[in-house]
């Protein structure tokens, strides 16, 4: 029997008798431990060897033996809990302790920096699992950040200034408006040991051609070793940025044959995935990374869905509750929470209904009906970006006739959506409109794969905003169902750098097709001993650039 199992059995005995000396029989103990009398005798012998208890057996049927506890079950439980924390056994820890609030406090006490067996380890607490890390699929904000730590593209977009930097390719050039050439570094290795081949790049990029942003790619070839040619059907000045976006990360060509690649992907990036399940994502520094090796050896993201709302909303948590003064950085997101109105719906296809809804559902009205707690994290949005004021306050007109019920759809594991939908329900009920709530998974939401009148969502844009704002929305299939116009002409202007993003955004907002609600405050909490931490527009930071100062002696 494993030590862990023996510990659990002892704790069960200690709890049954409250740690007090007692006279009992093997049969009674067998019933407590749900095993045979013979096995109980073996267990008691093992527990005596550990020094946890004393068992003085009395011979004869009906005789009661003396059980004396020499060690506290609480102390053993705490010892076991610490062992599970060291092993990142969060699921077993919840089973052992039985109290999720107590587990939460244990986890919080272990957040931040740890130094074990010569390795620097960073522990982060998060409120939901990160189960899809496959580039080119529907990725939420935190998954997007993790993919950037695991994979590389031909180019890299600097998170701080939006400038384009070398990555897998060290140089690139436009041979012609329809022909780009990228020169790749040699001796790049994937996490599973194989060297990067040109066919990996070719298969990674050609798999994206069905997606709107990449549909103008006609061919990807390698004329000579370490050279990649990308041929286009239309000019694209943003192509080098596009090939540095998270969708265009390079995968091993055999990725579809790898077991559970979405959860356990294989890239060439500074971190490789060691473990990814419901309660933990663990990544470790890749020693054969072609760039500067990461300074933090391991990043452990502990998942505890039962986190308090405060912890969910406050952002990335790298410290315990009692060190709230250690806010490293905060910023208003480049993006917003928004409503989209589905053109497939007879109701929201009606411009009068859309206009009335936008008049009713204002950011100020939502905040006034919401719990005061949210005012700390929500800032009224009048455009897609905080600096834009495209949504003018208007007088609420008479409700259109026949409007009695609407359906709102949003994706799961986003508690702020629950709060917003409750507020929307109140606002609409006051006007005699019943709001039906439909919760789907993120992929369904992303694809617009449901019948709905309105869709609640959020978008985080990154630098350069002239690139990411249009790219993020254009690659969202749901948006195509919520516009009364095609974007083909707009994408041509955007690729030629002639689309004015402020004007384009204002058009969507003023036509009541895209309705901004809030900008969210992103906050990063951690220890001041952390260095190299710069919060990006996704609310995270580049793990490979962070490091710890040595503790003071």
Swiss-Prot record:
**Ranges where the HTH marR-type domain occurs:** 1-117
Give positions of region: Solute-binding: 163-494
GO terms for biological process, alphabetical: negative regulation of DNA-templated transcription; peptide transport; positive regulation of DNA-templated transcription
The gene it comes from is sgrR
Q: What is this protein called?
A: HTH-type transcriptional regulator SgrR
Q: Which residues bind DNA?
A: 26-49
Task: Give the organism, scientific name.
Answer: Yersinia enterocolitica serotype O:8 / biotype 1B (strain NCTC 13174 / 8081)
GO MF entry, a single one = peptide transmembrane transporter activity
For this protein, the record's InterPro entries field holds: SBP_5, SBP_5_dom, SgrR_HTH_N, Tscrpt_reg_SgrR, WH_DNA-bd_sf
Described by its record, this protein's role is as follows:
Activates the small RNA gene sgrS under glucose-phosphate stress conditions as well as yfdZ. Represses its own transcription under both stress and non-stress conditions. Might act as a sensor of the intracellular accumulation of phosphoglucose by binding these molecules in its C-terminal solute-binding domain.
Give UniProt keywords alphabetically. Answer: Activator, DNA-binding, Repressor, Transcription, Transcription regulation
Q: Does the keyword Transcription regulation apply?
A: yes
């Amino acid at each position: 029997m494993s030590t862990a199992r023996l510990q659990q059995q002892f704790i069960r005995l200690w709890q049954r008798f409250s740690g007090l000396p007692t006279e009992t029989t093997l049969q009674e103990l067998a019933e407590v431990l749900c095993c045979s009398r013979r096995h109980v005798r073996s267990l008691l012998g093992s527990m005596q060897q550990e020094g946890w208890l004393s068992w003085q057996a009395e011979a004869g049927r009906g005789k009661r033996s003396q059980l004396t506890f020499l060690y506290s079950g609480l102390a053993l439980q705490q010892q076991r809990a610490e062992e599970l924390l060291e092993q990142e056994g969060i699921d077993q820890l919840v089973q052992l302790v039985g109290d999720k609030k107590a587990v939460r406090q244990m986890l919080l006490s272990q957040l931040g920096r740890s130094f074990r067996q010569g390795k620097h380890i960073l522990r982060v607490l998060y409120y939901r699992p990160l189960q899809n890390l496959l580039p080119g699929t529907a990725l939420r904000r935190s998954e997007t950040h993790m993919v950037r730590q695991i994979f590389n593209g031909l180019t890299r977009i600097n998170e701080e200034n939006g400038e384009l930097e070398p990555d897998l390719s060290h140089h690139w050039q436009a041979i012609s408006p329809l022909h780009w050439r990228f020169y790749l570094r040699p001796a790049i290795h994937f996490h599973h040991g194989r060297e990067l081949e040109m066919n990996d790049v070719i298969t990674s990029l050609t798999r994206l051609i069905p997606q709107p942003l990449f549909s103008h790619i006609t061919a990807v070839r390698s004329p000579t070793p370490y050279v990649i040619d990308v041929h286009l059907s239309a000019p694209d000045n943003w192509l080098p940025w596009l090939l540095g976006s998270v969708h265009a990360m390079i995968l091993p060509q055999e990725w579809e044959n790898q077991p559970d690649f979405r959860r356990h992907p294989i890239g060439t990036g500074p971190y490789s995935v060691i473990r990814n399940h419901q309660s933990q994502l663990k990544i470790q520094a890749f020693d054969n990374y072609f760039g500067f090796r990461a300074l933090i050896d391991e990043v452990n993201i502990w998942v505890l869905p039962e986190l308090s709302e405060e912890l969910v909303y406050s952002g990335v948590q790298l410290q315990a509750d009692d060190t709230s003064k250690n806010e490293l950085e905060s910023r208003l997101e480049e993006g917003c929470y928004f409503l989209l109105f589905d053109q497939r719906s007879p109701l929201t296809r009606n411009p009068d209904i859309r206009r009335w809804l936008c008049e009713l559902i204002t950011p100020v009205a939502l905040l006034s009906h919401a719990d005061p707690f949210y005012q700390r994290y929500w800032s009224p949005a009048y455009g897609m970006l905080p600096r834009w004021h495209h949504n003018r306050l208007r007088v609420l007109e008479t409700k259109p006739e026949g409007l009695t019920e609407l359906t709102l759809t949003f994706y799961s594991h986003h508690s702020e959506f629950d709060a917003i939908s409750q507020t929307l329900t109140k606002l609409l009920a006051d006007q005699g409109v019943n709001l039906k709530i439909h919760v789907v998974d993120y992929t369904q939401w992303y694809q617009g794969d449901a019948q709905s009148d309105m869709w609640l969502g959020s978008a985080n844009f990154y630098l350069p905003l002239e690139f990411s704002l249009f790219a993020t929305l254009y690659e969202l299939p749901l948006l195509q169902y919520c516009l009364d116009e095609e974007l083909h002409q707009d994408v041509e202007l955007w690729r030629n750098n002639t689309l004015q993003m402020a004007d384009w955004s204002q058009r969507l907002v003023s036509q009541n097709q895209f309705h901004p609600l809030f900008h969210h405050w992103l906050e990063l909490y951690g220890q001041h001993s952390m260095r190299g931490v710069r919060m990006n527009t996704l609310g995270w930071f580049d793990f490979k650039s962070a490091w710890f100062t040595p503790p003071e002696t």
